Amino acid sequence: SRVPHPAINRVAELMTRLPEFDSSDWRLIRDACRSSLPRFDIVLLGMGCSQFGERWEANDEDLMVEAFEEATKDAGVERHQIEAAWFGTAIEDQHVGKSGVPLAMTLRLPYIPVTRVENYCATGTEAFRGACYAVASGAVDIALALGVEKLKDTGYGGLPQRGRGNLNNLYWPNLSAPGSFAQLATAYSAKHGVDRGDLKRAMAHISVKSHDNASKNPKAHLRNRITEDDVLNAPMVAEPLGLYDCCGVSDGSACAIVTTPEIARSLGKTDLIGVKACQIAVSNGQELQYDEWDGSYFATTRIAAKRAYQEAGIKDPRNQVSLLVVHEDLNISAEGKGIGDVLDGFYDSAGSVPCQIDGGLKCFGHPIGASGLRMLYEMYLQLGGRAGERQTGDPVFGLTHNLGGFPSQNVSSVTIVGRLGA
């Protein structure tokens, strides 16, 4: 049954014991509800991803269709079987109106609910989360999430679009993403006593590794191999970040279709890939206050990762997670030890936990609404043993991490997928 009746009985029991309620009592009831609720499995029925890059020959509709057609073919469903959709896009210049209409009209969806979402760089993952929750609730049986961005035509280059209003802080137009993240790298080095040379070599190793992985991926934007010298001798963007430490501006789209295991099996699917956790944490302003945050880490990532591991039942992420997008705030590397793990090859394609095996944000660029789903697409291929030349053994769990905004105020998303039953 999809009716969570045990929770009702548990709440009734607690209410008879508590004559007066305070915040701690309500938390007790909330926790009891969560522990009593049955967990409904959600699986990836199909996924699709467009070619990423400078897609001057294609508009956003073309990119959406490219990803959608691959996803529906992979899932083995027709558009009339999709009961609800979530549309992730962040740059308003490419669409008329803030609604789900562009997705519904482009894909000719059959008058179903389409929800447009935007949540910084976690926009695609937010769309995916909405689709998963819809199926988990029992509201629909098959749901779609699609993210798209056409950045090259808008002229967007990573700077905040803060000039449109008159109530914004005046410093915002001068704050760039490379500048703010460079400050975090500097704070990290100072806190952990990291030599600048080691920091630069670790970042160069990541860039070289990402380009090598992308050379095997026909859908990546940048597929050229580079050397450590190329990275270290490249122009500086914001100390210590150089040209090859920053991702490109790209166009792209990615799509996921989710359902229940029972429906997936009825459609002939085997070796199902389940959605283990979807967690998002959003800054509340505490990082900007004079507290314990020192600018060397992402508080939201630590919180989202902790929740995701708990939801997925992962107790030892360093040994249980098979693939990921790396960040030591994910608790894979111990605090301050991430650089050593990178230089030791821990995150290489042949390492213990391969990272950015598709080329990552570095080589796909960052079409904002599409990136989260594009990351999941690689996990989906890897877990299904369909990544071709990039295949990394026989993974069990895959983790993706989106972070949008700035170190002091951001949205952090951690999603875990894995073999059903693992």
Question: What are the residue ranges of the model-derived segments?
Answer:
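Condensing-enzyme catalytic core mediating Claisen C-C bond formation in acyl metabolism
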Residues: 11-61, 167, 171, 191, ...
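Conserved catalytic cysteine-centered active-site region
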Residues: 37-40, 89-146, 150-180, 222-248, ...
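Short acidic, glycine/serine/threonine-rich loops at helix termini
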Residues: 56-58, 97-98, 154-160, 215-218, ...
